[in-house]
A protein has these predicted regions:
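N-terminal amphipathic alpha-helix/helix-capping segment at the start of soluble metabolic enzymes
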Residues: 1-17
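N-terminal active-site wall of soluble small-molecule enzyme domains
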Residues: 4-6, 25-27, 52, 56, ...
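Conserved mixed alpha/beta catalytic, RNA-binding, or beta-rich assembly cores of soluble enzyme
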Residues: 18-21, 25-27, 38-39, 45, ...
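A short, Lys/Arg-enriched amphipathic alpha-helix followed by its capping loop at the start of a domain
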Residues: 32-38
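Functionally critical alpha/beta secondary-structure elements and their flanking flexible loops
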Residues: 85
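Iron-sulfur cluster-binding cysteine motifs and their immediate structural context
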Residues: 91-126, 136-152
Length: 242
């Protein structure tokens, strides 16, 4: 499938987002773009998301890639709002392209049995399934109320069941300095999956020489034409690629 796409010189990949865990939205995106001719989709590494993509395909053939990342990689981060610092200005809500922020000040039941409420004070994602970690909310918050957390998935728990579902590619987002974690996860992926793999990295945290050295080490024992390398800058922001 991928070889055919590349030979046609018309290979378009729709990145639904490693952080996009909204199954309904993913199904709609895949249905729309596959109807328009797209045959390559990048998905969050969750069984329900792969299932949603397959429903969206409605029997059409396509190349499905799931994305995982190292701790701190922007692809797998989620925005959090600190209830103590948030002033409820709604700037983050207005700029969020995913509509992942509905209320800046969250009211939660601290003691449901007593029907008591209190403003949450611990940073946590809002509508986390929709947050893709683009950072636009962070850029407009003047009260330092927004931070990020990285979702650290257990690959041994997640990937085997996705492989059983018949995925076509696994992508490792390795935009960070921790070589130990990068190669630990990369070696595990190579151990359990012998198909197409993709490496996504950038110079944001590495020098150009270090980035090239890492990529060469990662592909050294890979078979020819079974590895995709992307060095495409910061993800999902829709802004300038630096």
């Amino acid at each position: 499938m991928l070889e055919e796409l590349l030979k046609s010189n018309k290979c378009f990949k729709l990145v639904c987002g490693a952080g996009n865990e909204d199954a309904i939205e993913v199904e709609k995106l895949v249905a729309l773009y596959s109807a328009a001719g797209c045959k390559f989709f990048d998905l969050s590494a969750k069984p329900e998301i792969v299932d949603a993509a397959k429903r969206g395909l409605r029997g059409k053939d396509a190349f499905l890639c799931v994305s995982v990342g190292i701790k701190g990689d922007p692809h797998v981060r989620k925005a959090c709002i600190d209830g103590e610092k948030c002033v409820g200005c709604h700037k983050c809500e207005e700029i969020c392209p995913q509509k992942a922020i509905k209320n800046c000040k969250m009211i939660v039941h601290s003691q449901p049995a007593l029907n008591e409420t209190a403003e949450t004070t611990s940073p946590r994602p809002l509508l986390a399934v929709r947050c893709i970690g683009c950072g636009k909310c962070y850029s407009v918050c003047s009260h330092n109320a927004i931070s990020f957390i990285s979702e650290n998935k257990d690959l041994e728990e997640v990937l085997p069941q996705l492989i059983e579902k018949g995925i076509d590619c696994i992508e490792l987002h390795a935009m960070g300095e921790d070589d130990l974690e990068v190669f630990e996860k990369w070696n595990y992926i190579n151990k359990i999956y012998d198909g197409m793999l993709s490496i996504c990295t950038a110079r944001g945290h590495l020098s150009e020489e270090k980035m090239i050295e890492r990529i060469k080490s990662m592909i050294a024992k890979r078979k020819d034409y079974l590895t995709i390398v992307q060095a495409d800058g910061y993800p999902m922001s829709g802004g300038k690629d630096d």
